[in-house]
């Protein structure tokens, strides 16, 4: 019985890790308020977090934003079907929202929601690494 429980726990951990692997990497955001960013997604405990590593003007020219190094995808917990729930920070207005995201290969759809998820804005990000 102990072996069965240990095997089930290992399988659960492996499933969570493989779900996180799908989103781990560097992603390019959509242009928001005249700029876009590269965000690196990494495991943070049992969840995934994303931090801005580079910022660019809409024309692609790099610029030094005060948001470089800021975590904007916060504690996104995998649901096991390619979807995640957690929080997202929007640098252009300084607000944190209930977040949802779904990864599909090299595409990621990220949503920030208010009013219990009734009103959401979304972005589609592209994997760059």
What does each of the following model-derived ranges do?
Residues 10-11:
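Short, linear, compositionally biased motifs with a strong N-terminal bias
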Residues 1-7:
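Sec-dependent signal peptide recognition
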């Amino acid at each position: 019985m102990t072996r069965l429980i240990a095997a089930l726990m290992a399988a659960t951990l492996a499933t969570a890790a493989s779900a996180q692997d799908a989103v781990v990497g560097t992603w390019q955001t959509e242009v928001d308020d005249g700029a876009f960013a590269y965000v690196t997604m990494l495991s943070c405990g049992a969840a995934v977090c994303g931090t801005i590593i580079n910022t660019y003007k809409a024309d692609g020219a790099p610029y030094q934003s005060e948001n470089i190094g800021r975590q904007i995808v916060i504690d996104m917990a995998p649901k096991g079907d390619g979807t995640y729930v957690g929080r997202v920070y929007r640098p252009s207005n300084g607000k944190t929202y209930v977040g949802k995201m779904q990864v599909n290969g090299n595409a990621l759809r990220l949503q920030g929601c208010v009013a219990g998820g009734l009103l959401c804005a979304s972005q589609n990000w592209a994997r760059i690494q």
